[in-house]
Structure formats: C-alpha cells, structure tokens
A protein has these predicted regions:
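Conserved ABC transporter NBD signature motif
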Residues: 61-69
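Helix-to-loop junction immediately C-terminal to a conserved catalytic motif
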Residues: 53
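Conserved signature/switch motifs of ABC ATPase nucleotide-binding domains
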Residues: 138, 159, 191
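ABC ATPase NBD coupling module
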Residues: 19, 70-87, 190
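Catalytic Walker B motif of ABC-type/P-loop ATPase nucleotide-binding domains
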Residues: 164-167
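The feature captures the beta-strand-to-loop junction immediately N-terminal to the Walker
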Residues: 38-40
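Conserved ABC ATPase signature
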Residues: 139-143, 147-149
Length: 227
C-alpha cells in the first residue's frame, strides 16, 4: 500500500518562476488493480506519478510504501526501493537508439547484478510474451510505435516489479494499438501487480480493466471514484 499525506511539489521554489505542481495531496493507494490519474496538461498527474514511483521527492508531506517512509530516505536506499518495486513506461518510451530490442529490455536489470545468461533468458521470455520474440536482435529505431510501446512494457517488467507506472501509455498510438496496450496492462493487474496510469485519453478512462479514476486539476485532486 502507498500512502501520501499532504504532499506538495514546488519547482523553482523562491524564484520568480516558482511553480506549484502539487498542492497538499493526500491519497491511499491499495495494492492491486488499475488506477488512472486523469487531467489536462499541467494538472500535476505526471508529477504525482514521479513522486509515487520514487523518481523525485516531495517539497513537503510524507510518502510511505507498505508503512516505510520513503520521502526522507537517503538516495541510495531510495534507488534500491525504486529498482525492486517499480517498473516504468514513459510517454516517449526512452528506448536507447543503437541498441537492440533485447539490450533495451535488459538495461534496468544490470545494476542488480543478475547473471548475464539468466538475464538474457528473462528478457527473451518477456519479448515472447509481448509478441516480439523475432524482433529481439533488431535495433529499436526500426520498430513501429506499437512495437516500441510493447518493448517499453517488457523493459518495465524485467526486474519483476510489483508496481507498474505508465505515463500517457497511449499518447502515440492509434485506437487499435491503444486498446492492445490497455489489455496488456489489464493482464498485468490480473497477475497481482498494481498499475498506475496517467492519461487524458478517453479510451483509457473507459477501459474495462480500470478500477479507480482520480482526477487532478491545478495540482489538486478534484474527483476520486471507483469504476
């Protein structure tokens, strides 16, 4: 379970261009299911996901994971929690050009020191699961948008995380590919993982796999409802 208590995030604090991205957000996120954070650009949904996923620290407030306070952990401990707990799918995919599909999937696992052969086997199995087995040796720049998105999903799973965070996962996809990705995320939730999605895509809000919809506006939660 993840809990946020009066969490705020301020960028450029004390400067003329100060920006309050989140304003005293309190939230309890239970394990399992698919939770979608919706809102227009600048509403704070992506910032909220970066805090939940321990990619950034709040300016004020507390964040706990299964009762453990994360918001004041030293960076090396926070990094360890992030690597073992969370898998990330970024809006721009963040695949490294010049590397193969297989090499991209393996990247997040290198710091954990797994044996190389074991890592290759795990990455190949994930690519097979996502219908990309035959693309393993291809350079990522040759992939279609849908293939790149599935590669990003496979990479997010390489460390077997319990929580998947997807920022605008359908942003660059047509309706058919969007439904495919949402189905894959739903399958992950069915495997006892927790899935958090930020989006302003109606296809995401209406997906049958979504259990909870949280709406943000100007850095505040303005609606929170089960689906």
């Amino acid at each position: 379970m993840i809990e946020l208590s009066t969490v705020s995030k301020v960028f450029h604090q004390g400067r003329p261009n100060e920006f309050r991205a989140l304003r005293e957000v309190s939230l309890t996120l239970a394990r399992g299911g698919v939770t979608v954070f919706k809102g227009p650009s600048g509403s704070g949904k992506t910032t909220l996901l970066t805090l939940i996923g321990a990619l950034a620290r709040p300016t004020s407030g507390r964040i706990t994971l299964n009762g453990r306070l994360l918001s004041n952990l030293p960076e090396r401990f926070l990094t360890d929690v992030r690597r073992h707990t969370f898998g990330f799918v970024f809006q721009q995919f963040n695949l490294l050009r010049g590397l193969t599909v297989l090499e991209n999937v393996m990247l997040p696992a290198y710091p954990l020191g797994r044996p190389y052969r074991q890592l290759v086997s795990a990455a190949q199995a994930l690519l097979e699961q996502f219908g990309l087995g035959e693309k393993a040796a291809n350079q990522v720049e040759w992939l279609s948008g849908g293939e790149a998105q599935r590669t990003a999903l496979a990479r997010a799973l390489i460390n077997n995380p319990t929580v998947i965070i997807a920022d605008e996962p359908t942003a660059h996809l047509d309706s058919a590919r969007s439904r495919e990705v949402l189905a894959l995320l739903g399958e992950l939730a069915a495997q006892d993982r927790t899935v958090f999605i930020s989006s302003h895509d109606p296809l995401v809000f209406e997906a049958v796999s979504v259990n909870r919809l949280i709406e943000l506006q100007d850095g505040r939660i303005v609606a929170d409802s089960p689906c």
